[in-house]
Amino acid sequence: MRVVVLGSGVVGVASAYYLARAGHEVTVIDREAGPALETSFANAGQISPGYAAPWAAPGVPLKAVKWMFEKHAPLAIRLDGTRFQLQWMWQMLRNCTADRYAVNKGRMVRLAEYSRDCLQALRADTGIQYEGRTGGTLQLFRTQQQLDGAAKDIAVLQEANVPFELLSPAELKNAEPALAAVSHKLTGGLRLPGDETGDCQLFTTRLAALAESLGVKFRYNTPIDALAIAGGRIAGVQCGSETVRADAYVVALGSYSTSFISNLMKIPVYPLKGYSITAPIVNDAAAPVSTVLDETYKIAITRFDQRIRVGGMAEIVGFDKNLRAARRETLEMCVNDLFPGGGDTSKATFWTGLRPMTPDGTPIVGRTPVSNLFLNTGHGTLGWTMSCGSGQLLADLISGKKPAIQADDLSVHRYLKDVAGQTRPAYA
């Protein structure tokens, strides 16, 4: 079958790779000059299935109000003048109940755990290298309230059989030796030894090369204007003056997926703006060995070979990609507070990207009401974590195979109107 994949971020490239492995003739189209040049370019570098969780959680609405008055708040909201933003935020608020959080987190962990299995198989099969490390993830708590609040996440981890370790301040140095100097600032940590790290852009670039070796064609610097529709099916992709035709089409355009298919269906994928800095390591002993999550500031600090990536925060501000100096200040403050002297933040590069986020946190992967149109978008901050599993899942669906995991609650159908004309809740 001929398949066109729109988008060459980590999700699009993974889709193309697994489709090619399944025997399909695949073409990837992207407006950029190469793979992983937008949201996948400088993310936090984490593959964290155990920390797969929706931003919509109990207590978040009250926290959001408090964060409005904090200098280093992890969340910021600025109205972008669209009705869609207001609708999306309302849907997110509806998912901030304990019941919905548990369901949403459960299915996110399901996909993320499967995706890690797919990544490990990929690595074993191909030997792909991307400055990867398998040292686990350590979530750091600065208050007793944060530590106590981790109980609900631990319950989900136990239910999903995800291994974890709850560490005291004195035990943190066993996972991250450099934290010994700052353990007095912390109340403990939750470590997931099965999590991994690496350079997502490097991974995507090398996966694209592997896909090319399987026959995938990449068309970069190509405009993606619209889908041509005939007889209730997709008849092609309009790329400037050319129409590219195939048997099936995959939309993996991240935050831009929403507007691109708006004439066909409505999907609640909104851009969640995030930031990162990447600093050279100047003192190996003072740098992290794997990756940590600062629960207070929602910031991840990740070790690459000779660099430290510091990323996080969320701004609900539309498609604004301006770099805000105050956000860089927060990132530098966090890494210098936990790993002082480990990296030279004065020489750090500064980046921002738009994560495609759904209000319930779960991505949209699978079939649509249009028989030959498939979606693979809405992964939020977990694009790399979920990319291989989403790509394999999509390849199975397009190939007519039964997926290895439950997939019906991952598709766009959970958002579409039921027979009574009511929009289904995101967790249905």
Swiss-Prot record:
Enzyme Commission code: 1.4.99.-
A single BP term in Gene Ontology: D-alanine catabolic process
Reactions listed under catalytic activity: a D-alpha-amino acid + A + H2O = a 2-oxocarboxylate + AH2 + NH4(+)
Record-level Gene Ontology MF annotations: D-amino-acid dehydrogenase activity
Family annotation (SUPFAM superfamilies): FAD-linked reductases, C-terminal domain, FAD/NAD(P)-binding domain
One cellular-component annotation, GO: cytoplasm
Domain of life of the source: Bacteria
Disulfide cysteine pairs (residue numbers): none
Swiss-Prot/TrEMBL cofactor(s): FAD
Keyword Oxidoreductase: yes
Positions contributing to FAD binding: 3-17
EC category: oxidoreductase
Pathway recorded for this protein: Amino-acid degradation; D-alanine degradation; NH(3) and pyruvate from D-alanine: step 1/1
Keyword set, alphabetical order: FAD, Flavoprotein, Oxidoreductase
Coiled-coil regions listed in the entry: none
Record function comment: Oxidative deamination of D-amino acids.
NCBIfam families given in the database record: PRK00711.1
Similarity remark: Belongs to the DadA oxidoreductase family.
Protein name, entry field: D-amino acid dehydrogenase
Species of the source: Burkholderia ambifaria (strain MC40-6)
